[in-house]
């Protein structure tokens, strides 16, 4: 049953802290989670405040306040007394006030625990993850949770409670009944408080009293509660005297498994007398009694170093007293050890000491005061590998480690001084002193032994702006050699000594160079030496500061706004690297693309440049300055000023029309700014579509080809021009049409009707594709079988689709084909139709002479009957078996034949054919651009030749017709020199066209180069400084005409010629400023000089002007007005001059403070009595002129400010005192004052000096005096003592009119006179603010009245 206990809340009895005899806060019972006292290794540090607690001296009630610290990301659930539950999201410090003595229970999520921490007198419950788990069996009885009712007792001495330090022995279950102590006679009555608990530490091998059950399983919650109790004892026993106290029992929960962590290093000898009580174990139903036992607990403390990993064996000797059934009063006399490490325990420190306990139960002496002894002895090791739950990586604080020795030493002295308690008697005091002495000696010896891996604090050297060198030395003791393997971890923090550290180096070296540091930054270092996972040591934290340097390069400036003549820029500051940025330096290229020059220097983060050119590119870069110097420049930012929208361009022109495309070209509009880049948008609308214009091209080119159009279709076009400012107006609309395509070939022709011997009708259909246009004509071609050359001839050309061909011959085969023609061209021929004309019967035959006698077996033929005068023959025939086969009829056939007359004799006529093939033409070069072509006459083939056709071209397969006529010679002109040409000839007669003859080839001879096609001026190639004496030109290389170009002749000015090599750019130098030159060029090759190109006119710019004289016309204490040059009434472009005024800054560099055409400028925001240096520079279109000499001007001293109106105080009947405010000296110069009085229209100076008051007497009665004062600044110069006066103050009125008493006749005058005087004084002293406020109130009243009137009128 003891292993199945449910995790319920346990009650931890607290103590009552008392400081300086006054109660601090009576602690009530805590209701905490059972896991509240578990130790968490990832908590950074828990500081325990050490207090001295004494008995109560006066009655006083206090409330218990507990702060629950909730980590980020966690949720705290609190259940109040009324049953309500509240969730609190971390991070937060939740104060819990318990005036009734019971805090609400805190429910924790699984895997978390609560830990009580006391910092600066405030107890906190820290919610942390549960990370440690102990499994070491210990003999102890398992008890059910029992909450004892609080009893009214006196305040008790500090209890034996220990802080939850890792590595300590847990608290086993030991229950005592609460006892009451009668009030002491020497103390006043105190309020009764709940009892405290006594915790006795027992070894799992101890001998239990009769009736007590031995359990080997411990509850983990008990361990945590025990650690909490040990922490509380340690916090309350520091520096205290031995105090008698009563211990009350505490109900603890035990579980089956628990470890035995090492005991604390600060255990001190003490004696505990237990009170009688009864303990009942529900799991075993055993009852045992401890009523008759008085226990004396003796603790032997032997400190050990935890780093050695050699735990001690804790031995407890228990002796049962023989005096049974004698209840006793339990007291505890505590004598504290003097070890320097016994009073401070930090959960983050990895070195702990272990002690050995001997508990001896002795019978009470006559005085019922238990004795306390302390023995210092070492115990043999029991466990070889004691678990050390503390990790150096879980929040170890080296600063605490470094300060342990000093704090411990101070606390040791305090504890030794507090160890003499007058309440300890006789033997017990002596035993305690001897025990403390021996323990102190042992602890002193242990403290003098060095750690096995102690290292000195790291040394930082060679500290640079962004790097530093860190080195350290390591030590060793006798147990470990310094040469043994070890690892060093160097951790760096930049957010404070207790901030987050980051490991930047791990290795066995002792010197590390740090890189990538930030300038002017404080860094903290610590070194951890690791031998293995259980032996670590941390050095003291060392801090160093990197020096400052110049700022980081800032980001490039950004554009706020722009106009045609201005640009507004802004920028952000970069890292100042330890010194505040004093100014920014903005440079620009002035729109020329050359070297950068300063345009602004100051602290502002924005700047606006004026008087810029429209649509111009400007480049900027930025640098920052501080006391260390100037940073590098930022990246270059490019901005453009605004400009005008371009004018409307001309309509686009048709460059070439295709079947499915149109090529257009256009000209750029007249652009006033040549630097402006134009973009063009071409829009198109298909005619009769009604869809409107749609963009088809967007780019910077001046040509465009639109494809995928429909053939023989009309389209509309217009064009826009764009620049950075917007779109121009559209150009005029133009219409262009795509070309039609050649028609498709017609279908195969067909025969209409019957084929006759001499005629046939041929028909054909329309082609399926007419190419987008109507067919204009059809052509029918025929080819006879008799033509071995298979020549086609056109027999018909027209618009009809049927043709009667009546020039046929009987028994002849013909081939026919047809093609059609449209305005787009000629189609391909159709498929071939083959026909054969039938044979004709003979009309008459001539009798052939017979040779010899013949005998005819045929019957006699009857007489022929003539039909239409011709004999008729009757023939019976059969159908031929095959095509074109005739069968003769036998004379014995039944059919009778009639014989015709004899035929006539005739002669044969030869057939006519196209001409034969021509021969190869003969080519003769007449010159580089002329060739004579001649050829011979071919055979005519029965028909006279009427024409010759000559084809000519540069490619043999692509020649074109250049001549048609009867001549046998043709002269070709306009040829290109040094070029190869091809030609051929064919003859034509009335029958047809003959075949082409052979192809001839000729190459024209070379000659002088062609004329240079393009010559233009290039202004960008000439620097601005040389533009007055130089002109740059560029040209395109012409055709060389068969001989490479070797150079060029450039003619300029008064027929001056410069010969250059084969280049296309040249700069003419040593020209006259502001002069126009006519320039032309010719090319040179082996054959000679080419013609001159068309001339161009170029003008040099005038020389840059000289700087004018700079003068200062107005001196001020904060400004200087400068003037230079003269103002011209007529400003033309030729004499337009800008001026640059430069001023020296703190670094000695001159920067531009004004740029423009004005001749005056006021420099403001200057310091008084300071010398400033200036330069001036004149600029025109030729560039910037030379800078002038340095001009030095000094500002004046600043005058004092105006004083308030003086105050007049009458002294007696004939004198008054005038007072005014005083001013502090200005930069060490004394202040003097001048008092002036005005009577009527006359003003007199009545005082001048350093005083602030003056007595005025002997004034006239019935007069008005006005006093005003001004301050002056007195200083010395080489000319002597000088005075600089400020403005006068407002005047103060003083009236000397006599006033009569109120009961007399002049009482009315007195009142009136007073009223007038006050009114006049108020009028005089009314300030500007009062006047403005009066006006505002008046306007407000008028507005309200108007609003009321308007509303009233509208409602009515």
From Swiss-Prot:
It comes from the Eukaryota. Pfam families: fn3. Residues 1351-1356 are cytoplasmic. It is a single-pass membrane protein. GO terms for cellular component: membrane. InterPro entries: FN3_dom, FN3_sf, Ig-like_fold, Striated_Muscle_Regulatory. This is Fibronectin type III domain containing protein 3C1.
């Amino acid at each position: 049953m003891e292993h199945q206990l449910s995790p319920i809340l346990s009650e931890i009895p607290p103590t009552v802290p008392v400081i300086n005899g006054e109660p601090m806060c009576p602690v009530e019972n805590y209701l905490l989670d059972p896991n509240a006292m578990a130790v968490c290794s990832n908590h950074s540090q828990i500081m325990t405040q050490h207090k001295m607690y004494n008995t109560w001296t006066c009655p006083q009630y206090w409330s218990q306040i507990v702060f629950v610290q909730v980590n980020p990301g966690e949720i705290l659930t609190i259940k109040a007394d009324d049953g309500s539950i509240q969730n609190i999201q971390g991070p937060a410090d939740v104060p819990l006030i318990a005036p009734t003595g019971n805090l609400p229970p805190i429910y924790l999520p699984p895997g978390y625990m609560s830990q009580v921490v006391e910092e600066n007198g405030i107890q906190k419950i820290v919610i942390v993850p549960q990370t440690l788990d102990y499994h070491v069996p210990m003999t102890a009885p398992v008890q059910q949770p029992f909450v004892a009712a609080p009893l009214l007792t006196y305040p008790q001495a500090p209890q034996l409670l220990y802080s939850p330090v890792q590595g300590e022995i847990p608290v086993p279950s030991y229950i005592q009944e609460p006892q009451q102590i009668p009030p002491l006679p020497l103390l006043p009555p105190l309020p009764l408080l709940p009892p405290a608990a006594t915790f006795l530490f027992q070894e799992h091998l101890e001998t239990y009293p009769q009736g007590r059950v031995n359990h080997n399983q411990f509850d983990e919650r008990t361990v945590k509660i025990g650690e909490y109790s040990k922490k509380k004892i340690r916090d309350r026993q520091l520096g205290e005297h031995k105090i008698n106290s009563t211990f009350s029992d505490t109900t603890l929960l035990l579980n089956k498994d628990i470890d035995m962590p090492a005991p604390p290093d600060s255990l001190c000898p003490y004696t505990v007398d237990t009170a009688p009580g009864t303990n009942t174990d529900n799991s075993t139903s055993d009852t045992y009694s401890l009523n008759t036992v008085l226990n004396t607990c003796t603790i032997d403390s032997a400190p050990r170093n935890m780093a050695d990993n050699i735990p001690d064996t804790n031995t407890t000797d228990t002796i049962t007293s023989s005096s049974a059934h004698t209840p006793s009063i339990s007291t505890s006399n505590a004598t504290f050890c003097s070890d320097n490490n016994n009073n401070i325990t930090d959960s983050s420190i990895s070195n702990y000491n272990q002690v050995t306990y001997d508990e001896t139960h002795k019978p009470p002496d006559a005085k019922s005061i238990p004795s306390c002894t302390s023995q210092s002895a070492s115990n043999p090791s029991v466990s070889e590998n004691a678990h050390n739950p503390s990790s150096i990586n879980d929040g170890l604080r080296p600063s605490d480690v470094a300060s342990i020795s000093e704090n411990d030493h101070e606390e040791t002295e305090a504890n030794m001084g507090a160890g003499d308690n007058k309440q300890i008697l006789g033997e017990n005091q002596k035993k305690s002193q001897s025990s403390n002495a021996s323990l102190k000696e042992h602890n002193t010896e242990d403290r003098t032994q060095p750690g096995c891996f102690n290292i000195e604090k790291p040394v930082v050297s060679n500290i640079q702006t962004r790097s530093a060198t860190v080195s350290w030395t390591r030590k060793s003791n006798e147990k470990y050699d310094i040469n043994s393997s070890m690892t060093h971890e160097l951790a760096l923090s930049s957010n404070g000594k207790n901030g987050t550290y980051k490991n930047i180096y791990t290795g066995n070296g002792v010197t590390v160079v740090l890189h990538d540091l930030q300038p002017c930054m404080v860094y903290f270092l610590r070194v951890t030496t690791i031998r293995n996972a259980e032996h670590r040591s941390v050095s003291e934290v060392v801090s160093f500061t990197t020096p400052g340097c110049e700022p980081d390069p800032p980001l490039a400036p950004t554009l706020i706004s722009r106009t045609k003549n201005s640009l507004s820029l802004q920028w952000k500051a970069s890292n100042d690297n330890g010194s505040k940025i004093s100014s920014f330096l903005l440079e620009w290229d002035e729109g020329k693309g050359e070297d950068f020059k300063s345009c602004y220097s100051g602290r502002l983060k924005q700047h606006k440049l004026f008087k810029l050119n429209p649509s111009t590119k400007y480049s900027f870069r930025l640098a920052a300055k501080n006391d260390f110097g100037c940073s590098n420049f930022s990246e270059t930012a490019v901005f453009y000023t605004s400009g005008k929208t371009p004018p409307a361009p001309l309509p686009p022109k048709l460059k070439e029309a295709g079947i499915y495309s149109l090529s257009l070209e256009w000209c750029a509009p007249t652009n006033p700014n040549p630097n402006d880049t134009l973009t063009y948008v071409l829009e198109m609308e298909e005619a009769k579509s009604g869809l409107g214009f749609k963009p088809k091209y967007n780019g910077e080119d001046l040509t465009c080809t639109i494809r995928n159009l429909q053939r023989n279709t009309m389209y509309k076009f217009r064009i826009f021009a764009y620049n950075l400012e917007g779109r121009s107006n559209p150009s005029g609309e133009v219409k262009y049409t795509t070309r039609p395509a050649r028609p498709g070939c017609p279908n195969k022709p067909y025969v209409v009707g019957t084929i006759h011997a001499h005629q046939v009708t041929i028909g054909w259909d329309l082609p399926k594709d007419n190419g987008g246009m109507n067919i204009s004509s059809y052509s029918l071609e025929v080819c006879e079988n008799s033509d071995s050359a298979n020549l086609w001839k056109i027999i018909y050309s027209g618009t009809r689709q049927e043709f009667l061909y009546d020039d046929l011959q009987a028994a002849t085969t013909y081939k026919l084909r047809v093609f059609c023609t449209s305005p787009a061209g000629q189609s391909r021929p159709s498929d071939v139709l083959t026909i054969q004309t039938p044979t004709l019967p003979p009309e008459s035959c001539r009798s052939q002479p017979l040779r010899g006698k013949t005998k005819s077996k045929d019957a006699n033929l009857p007489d022929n009957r003539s039909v239409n005068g011709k004999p008729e023959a009757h023939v019976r025939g059969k159908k031929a078996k095959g095509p074109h086969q005739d069968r003769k009829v036998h004379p014995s056939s039944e059919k009778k034949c009639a014989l015709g007359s004899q035929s006539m004799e005739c002669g044969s006529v030869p057939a006519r054919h196209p001409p034969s093939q021509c021969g190869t033409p003969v080519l003769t070069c007449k010159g580089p651009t002329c060739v004579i072509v001649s050829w011979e006459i071919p055979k005519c083939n029965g028909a006279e030749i009427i024409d010759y056709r000559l084809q000519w071209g540069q490619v043999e397969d692509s020649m074109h017709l250049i001549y048609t006529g009867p001549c046998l010679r043709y002269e070709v002109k306009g040829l290109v020199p040094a070029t190869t040409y091809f030609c051929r000839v064919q003859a034509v007669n009335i029958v047809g066209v003959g075949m082409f003859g052979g192809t001839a080839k000729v190459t024209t001879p070379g000659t002088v180069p062609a004329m240079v096609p393009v010559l233009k001026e290039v202004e960008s190639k000439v620097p601005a400084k040389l533009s007055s004496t130089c002109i740059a030109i560029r040209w395109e290389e012409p055709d060389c005409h068969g001989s490479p170009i070797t150079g060029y002749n450039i003619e300029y000015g008064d027929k001056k010629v410069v010969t250059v090599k084969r280049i296309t750019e040249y700069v003419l130098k040593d020209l006259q400023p502001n002069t126009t030159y006519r320039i032309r060029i010719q090319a040179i090759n082996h054959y000679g000089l080419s013609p001159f190109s068309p001339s161009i006119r170029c003008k040099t710019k005038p020389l840059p002007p000289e700087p004018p004289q700079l003068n200062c016309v107005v001196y001020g204490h904060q400004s200087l007005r400068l003037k230079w040059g003269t103002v011209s009434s007529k400003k033309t472009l030729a004499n337009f001059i800008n001026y640059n005024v430069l001023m020296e800054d703190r670094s000695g560099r001159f920067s531009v403070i004004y740029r423009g055409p004005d001749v005056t400028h006021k420099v403001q925001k200057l310091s008084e009595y300071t010398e400033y240096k200036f330069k001036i520079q004149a600029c025109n279109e030729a560039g910037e002129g030379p800078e002038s000499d340095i001009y030095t001007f000094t500002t004046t001293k600043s005058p004092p400010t105006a004083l308030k109106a003086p105050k007049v105080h009458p002294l007696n009947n004939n004198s008054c005192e005038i007072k005014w405010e005083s001013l502090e000296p200005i930069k060490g110069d004394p202040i003097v004052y001048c008092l002036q009085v005005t009577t009527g229209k006359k003003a007199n100076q009545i005082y001048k000096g350093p005083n602030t008051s003056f007595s005025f007497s002997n004034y006239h009665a019935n007069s008005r005096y006005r006093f005003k004062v001004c301050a002056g600044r007195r200083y010395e110069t080489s000319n002597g003592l000088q005075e600089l006066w400020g403005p006068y103050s407002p005047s103060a009125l003083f009236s000397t009119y006599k006033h009569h008493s109120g009961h007399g006749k002049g009482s009315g005058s007195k009142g009136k006179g007073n009223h007038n005087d006050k009114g006049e004084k108020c009028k005089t002293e009314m300030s500007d603010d009062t006047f403005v406020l009066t006006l505002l109130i008046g306007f407000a009243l008028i507005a309200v009245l108007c609003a009321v009137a308007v509303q009233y009128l509208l409602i009515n």
